[in-house]
Every structure is written in structure tokens, then in C-alpha cells.
């Protein structure tokens, strides 16, 4: 993946993210995938993806997903449909609209207006492990410790690290399952 980033000179010590140009046409991969929000009020389906799974470290993406980076995958517009509900939309810049579930807050969508595709958050996929990142950009916002993640101590599973709370959380789980359902109590 060849990516070109353009940044202006720092203003008041901050670098501003201005443009990202992907210097190739991502390959369209026919596949069926589904996904949606945590509560199940918003669901989607796609009949193809692009080989563009990536993470973006820019500050705007960090704010949009409430995390250190956004994990996204491109989907051709003609292959995508909302199957239950629709996200609430927020215009984060003139060309970009982001979508999230109004009920549970799950970030779902990054939509650049003039693009032939849209991006969904990889974490909202029913099988996110199937689409590991193939690239990253927005490096001006990347956390300085990002490269050290694999060196952080692994404390164990939820059941091991939260043994006192895990059974009650599991027994009262309101999260939508990782597959389509005919209906849901969202």
C-alpha cells in the first residue's frame, strides 16, 4: 500500500492533517460481511470489501472513535446497505461525515463525500479478526508508545482479571451477538 501524506508547517507546535492520497486503486474482494453497533439498533451488510483495511492515528479519528486510533475498512458504495436502522451522522469536516449509533454510541462509519467507497469501523464487523490492518496513516497523531504495545504485560482474560465482576456482566449482557438476527430488543 503506497500512501502519500501532506502536512503543512506546524502552527503553534501542532501538525495539521491536510490530505491523504492512496496511490493505488484498492482491489475489490467479493465477500459477504455483516456488522453493526453494540446494542443492535443499527446493522449493515456488504457484498464486497476493498483490500484497504487500515488504522488512522489522526486526532480527528481518535476523537471520533474515542481511542488512540481508528481501525477502518473500505467498502464499495454499491456493495453496502443498512439492514436495520441507520446511524446518526456528524459532519466532522467539510468532506467527511461520520456515523454512530444514537442509542449506544458505537462509532460505525467514515464517509468521504467524493470517494467511490465508504469506510466502516473494523471493530463493528461481526468478524473483525478477518480483516487485519494492511496499512496505517495519520502518523502525526500516533501515540509515541504505539510501537511498544506488544511489550505491555498481558494480564489475562476478562474472567481472570475481573473475576469478581465478569459473571454478572456475562449474565446480564445486552450486547447484540456477532451475527444478524431477525429482531433485537435495542
Report each predicted region and the residues it spans:
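A short Gly-Trp-Pro
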Residues: 2-34, 41-186
